[in-house]
Swiss-Prot record:
One Gene Ontology molecular-function label: structural constituent of ribosome
Pfam families named among the record's database cross-references: Ribosomal_L14e
Cellular component annotations (GO), alphabetically ordered: cytosolic large ribosomal subunit
Keyword Kinase: no
Family recorded in the similarity comment: Belongs to the eukaryotic ribosomal protein eL14 family.
Organism this protein belongs to: Drosophila virilis
Region of interest called Disordered, as start-end residue ranges on this chain: 136-160
Compositionally biased tracts (Basic and acidic residues): 146-160
Alphabetized InterPro entries for the sequence: Rib_uL2_dom2, Ribosomal_eL14, Ribosomal_eL14_dom, Translation_prot_SH3-like_sf
Protein keywords: Ribonucleoprotein, Ribosomal protein
Gene3D superfamilies from the UniProt entry: 2.30.30.30, 6.10.250.2270
Protein name (record): Large ribosomal subunit protein eL14
Biological processes annotated in GO: negative regulation of neuron apoptotic process; ribosomal large subunit biogenesis; translation
Length: 160
């Protein structure tokens, strides 16, 4: 699969450092190999130059003319329904979960740990009942040790 996230006009990027950290911006123009002109009309980012080292390119791209004014970028952003697409993307969901997790207090962490313990207890009980049922049915359970012994027996038969 070839590389598809190019630095180009209309490419949506996520700012990774500085005061804009976490915000989405659209690349309007490439200034040089290290800097681009970005604009984020719906994310509260004014048009400014930004270092490429501080941007993470996304798979999203909106169509607008080269060096378009902010109003045209805003219109293209709204027309592409980018906010809804970004909200359901795995990248956004993971970032939201990290943010939620970092805001847990001590009691919330305790409740989370207790809930995980309860879930694991239920899973263990269900697994053990299934294991007992397969054992009582007489269905063969193939373990690595059994498999090794069966292979040795087959080799011994083949030699005779």
């Amino acid at each position: 699969m070839p590389f598809e996230r190019f630095v180009q006009t209309g490419r949506i990027a996520k700012a990774s450092a500085g005061p804009l950290k976490g915000r989405l911006v659209a690349i309007v123009d490439v200034i040089d190999q290290n800097r681009v002109l970005v604009d984020g009309p719906l994310t509260g980012v004014p048009r400014q130059e930004y270092r490429l080292n501080n941007l993470h390119l996304t798979k999203y791209r909106i169509k607008f003319p080269y060096t378009a004014p902010t109003r045209i970028v805003r219109k293209a952003w709204v027309d592409s329904d980018l906010k809804a697409q970004w909200k359901v993307s795995p990248w956004s969901v993971k970032a939201q979960n990290i943010c939620k997790r970092s805001q847990l207090n001590d009691f919330d962490r305790f409740k989370l740990r207790y809930a995980k313990r309860q879930r694991n207890k239920l899973l263990t009980i269900a697994f053990n009942t299934l294991k007992k049922r397969t054992k009582s049915d007489g269905t063969p359970r193939i373990l690595k040790k059994d498999r090794r012994e069966r292979l040795r027996a087959e080799k011994a038969k083949a030699k005779k």
